[in-house]
Swiss-Prot record:
Its EC number is 6.1.1.20. It catalyses: tRNA(Phe) + L-phenylalanine + ATP = L-phenylalanyl-tRNA(Phe) + AMP + diphosphate + H(+). The keyword Nucleotidyltransferase does not apply. It comes from Campylobacter lari (strain RM2100 / D67 / ATCC BAA-1060). GO terms for molecular function: ATP binding; magnesium ion binding; phenylalanine-tRNA ligase activity; tRNA binding. It is an enzyme of class 6 (ligase). Keywords: Aminoacyl-tRNA synthetase, ATP-binding, Cytoplasm, Ligase, Magnesium, Metal-binding, Nucleotide-binding, Protein biosynthesis. This is Phenylalanine--tRNA ligase alpha subunit. CDD domains: PheRS_alpha_core. Mg(2+) binds at residue 246.
Amino acid sequence: MQDLISQISSASTLAELENIKVSVLGKKGILTLEFAKLKDLQGEEKKEFANGLNKTRDEFNEAYQVKLKELEEKALNEKMKQDVQDFSFFDETSNAGALHPIMQTMDKIIEYFTALNFSIEKGPLIEDDFHNFEALNLPQNHPARDMQDTFYFEDKTLLRSQTSPVQIRTMLSQKPPIRMIAPGAVFRRDFDITHTPMFHQVEGLVVEEGDKINFANLKDMLENFLKYMFGDVKVRFRPSFFPFTEPSAEVDISCVFCKGCGCRVCKHTGWLEVLGCGVVDPNVYKFVGYKNVSGYAFGLGVERFAMLLHKIPDLRSMFEGDLRLLEQFR
């Protein structure tokens, strides 16, 4: 047995160790041939001989397993030394991923408002008539309710056409003061150079008790926001109409392409429309059970902002997955 143990100890590779095992326990191995002799023995002699062989086999297997573990660890360490990789090495030929320009724009918008302590609120993509229309003061005959503008399901639910329903859900679940934005996807039946059936909006809402909030607060906040997004641009507010705000306004900035001089993009007006806003209509407060409060709301299209920030002429190109375009925004 000592000779077998010394053979195991002298093995320097896994192959050598395996050859020793075969020479001992293989079909023609030393111990295998010894076990074959048991058939010629009888009684006590057979029992003693078998016990001795079993003990020898167990000791051999134990020594073999210890040596096997040692040689496996040695082989692994040698392989790791040969396969050393520098994980700090940057391969300039690899195609590193990057955020889509729409997501880059969305992140920049969210960054601004979260710095002003606006919360980020979410809502379902499939909405009901109450949250998407009725509670927002959109009457039954409003054009937005028409099937040519909104995606309806058979059970009269719909794909939300704006993120404004999130404002309603937030007011129904929270009490003033509220400072929130609702970023997310919305859906409308429209597809051309400046519209897609699915696009992204960020809508904001500020509500406080009493009459603390007015249009001047809204105007100041949006002017600062637009200068943060587009740099030193001029901002103007034009009277408009939205069912859920009164008074309402559309907001323009001086054209980022021609610096307000007039070009094809701004239709030679020098101005580009970027968002809508207004003081929340009192009828909206009635639907959510608010009393003696004041507030303002605003909404913008993220794709519109991305087009202006990155000077992308066709909105549809941002949804085609063309790497030649997307690689420019790494």
